[in-house]
Amino acid sequence: QRQLAGFLRRHGVDLIVGSHPHVVQPYEQDSNGIVLYSLGNFVSNQRKRYCDGGIVATVEVTRSPDGSLRYSLELTPVWVLTPGYRITPSEVGDTLSMPADSRQRYERFMTDTRLLLGL
């Protein structure tokens, strides 16, 4: 992944978004662009640790008067609550309505994901 991302960046690609590993992976951001190695799972029945959630990436690209591009990135962890496959963002607030085992998995995913991404 890193070799491919490096190759693409050297050849002018500014924004790279990966998804296949089914788990959230680190990202890189600098003045030349953003590499999101994996967004994890958005809607999935995979319930293994780290496979039961993902991140929503909001990227804003603006062009400066000199023609250069600027990138801003906002990452929002989300967790898939089953049954029903409800996407549950990190700001859900009320986890008390979740079954205890779901609440524990939700909190573990959010804690681990925030640590991984430095949020």
Name the predicted role of every residue range.
Residues Q1-I55:
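Conserved beta-sheet core of the metallophosphoesterase superfamily
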Residues D52-L119:
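A short C-terminal boundary segment appended to hydrolase-like catalytic domains
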